[in-house]
């Protein structure tokens, strides 16, 4: 992995035009100041020139992918906002919906006219014994290209699909999360030897839809919810059995997803910082991945599975459609008891001033605008990027002598 250069330039036409107009207004005001303000050396004029130069630098120069003014504004907004309210906004109770000829009951969450549904994916080991799958791969994976192909399904256009994976480190918590009581009873969680229990990964696909972009699709179906549920069921059926086990979640399961993605982060006890998010039992630090580095090797490295400082990792891959082509971006969040050592984040780009936004962007929450915008790359036709799901290593077999 390689982090992008710390400083850069944002030179879009819209930004340059806005900055030019602001500078022009500043110079006009400075040139029309009273003579008593100008003095012999035209002090007011040169002060105006200095302010214009400062505004230009702050608006054009970027730090870690964001302009200085945007970074400071975002940080001040997060710092002044109540984290509990900010993270809870949009986490409305979901409603179960089943299509007239549908098979599954799908939970739909609505907020400000936008809709969200969630698909859970895993390796299928916990399914009933009578359910057979003809998997085309040896290990359970989510093929990113397959998900991207389903951003548009006939007349339904999704705003985007987020692939969110949470990995809890080995130990008692991961043993509980692995949910195999026959293999690991409660009395055995604390009796593991030197080898740790398996790191537990849980993965969800979060589908987002803007009804205003799907007027024709909605007109031919029962309702808004039915339109998104149709796309959700179709994507789940495409993934299920081919490379992983997939099923849409019901309404009562969405609240559990909120809690799992927060990874024990308590919103009401959190304080946003410039470089991390401080909460009552540790730190949450978010980074974005350089687009050119979003590949299988990088996705294997970002977990930091061997780092004892990290208790949980949350990885988000975002797929959106831009100009008819799918684009991919990624960011990762680490939970630790202390501040994350710098050597663990080498090659990643810190989300400076946007730590709270990074947490909220990973939640299954409908939003009228993107909570987080990071650099992305085009997903090519031959891109074979896959995200493994399920456990990352076998349970420890060593135990105490008495056991």
UniProtKB/Swiss-Prot annotation:
Top-level division of the source organism's lineage: Bacteria
InterPro entries: EccE_dom, T7SS_EccE
Keywords: Cell inner membrane, Cell membrane, Membrane, Transmembrane, Transmembrane helix, Transport
Cellular compartments per GO CC: plasma membrane
Transmembrane helix recorded as keyword: yes
Pfam families: EccE (PF11203)
Subcellular location: Cell inner membrane
Main location: membrane
Membrane topology recorded in Swiss-Prot or TrEMBL: Multi-pass membrane protein
Transmembrane feature ranges: 9-29, 43-63
Keyword Transport appears in the UniProt entry: yes
Subunit structure: Part of the ESX-5 / type VII secretion system (T7SS), which is composed of cytosolic and membrane components. The ESX-5 membrane complex is composed of EccB5, EccC5, EccD5 and EccE5.
Function: Part of the ESX-5 specialized secretion system, which is responsible for the secretion of EsxN and a number of PE_PGRS and PPE proteins.
Family: Belongs to the EccE family.
Designated name of the protein: ESX-5 secretion system protein EccE5
């Amino acid at each position: 992995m390689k982090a992008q250069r710390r400083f850069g330039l944002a030179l879009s036409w819209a930004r340059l035009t806005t900055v030019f107009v602001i500078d022009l207004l500043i110079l006009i005001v400075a040139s029309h100041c009273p003579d008593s303000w100008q003095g012999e050396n035209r002090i007011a004029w040169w002060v105006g020139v200095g302010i214009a130069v400062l505004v230009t630098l702050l608006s054009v120069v970027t730090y870690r992918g964001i302009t200085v003014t945007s970074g400071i504004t975002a940080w001040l907004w997060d710092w002044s906002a109540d984290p509990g309210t900010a993270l809870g906004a949009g986490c409305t109770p979901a409603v179960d919906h089943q299509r007239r000829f549908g098979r599954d009951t799908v939970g739909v969450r609505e907020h400000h006219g936008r809709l969200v549904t969630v698909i859970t994916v895993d390796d299928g080991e916990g399914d009933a014994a009578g359910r057979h799958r003809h998997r085309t791969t040896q290990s359970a994976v989510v093929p990113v290209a397959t998900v991207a192909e389903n951003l548009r399904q006939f007349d339904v256009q999704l705003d985007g699909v987020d692939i969110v994976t949470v990995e809890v480190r080995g130990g008692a918590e991961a043993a509980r999360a692995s949910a195999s009581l026959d293999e690991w009873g409660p009395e055995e969680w604390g009796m593991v030897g030197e080898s740790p229990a398996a790191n537990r990964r849980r993965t969800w696909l979060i589908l987002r839809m803007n009804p205003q972009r799907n007027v024709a699709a909605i007109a031919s179906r029962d309702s808004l919810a039915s339109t998104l549920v149709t796309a959700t069921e179709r994507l789940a059926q495409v993934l299920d059995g081919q490379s992983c086990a997939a099923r849409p979640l019901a309404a009562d399961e969405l609240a559990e997803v909120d809690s799992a993605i927060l990874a024990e982060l308590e919103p009401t006890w959190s304080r946003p910082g410039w470089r991390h998010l401080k909460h009552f039992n540790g730190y949450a630090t978010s980074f974005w991945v350089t687009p050119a580095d979003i590949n299988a090797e990088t996705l294997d490295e970002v977990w930091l599975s061997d780092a004892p400082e990290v208790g949980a990792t949350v990885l988000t891959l975002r797929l959106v459609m831009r100009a008819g082509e799918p684009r991919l971006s990624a960011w990762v969040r680490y939970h630790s008891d202390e501040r994350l050592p710098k050597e663990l984040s080498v090659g990643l780009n810190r989300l400076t001033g946007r730590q709270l936004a990074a947490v909220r962007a990973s939640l299954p929450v409908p939003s009228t605008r993107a909570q987080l915008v990071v650099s992305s790359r085009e997903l090519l036709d031959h891109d074979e990027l896959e995200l493994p799901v399920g456990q990352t290593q076998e349970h420890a077999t060593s135990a105490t002598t008495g056991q």
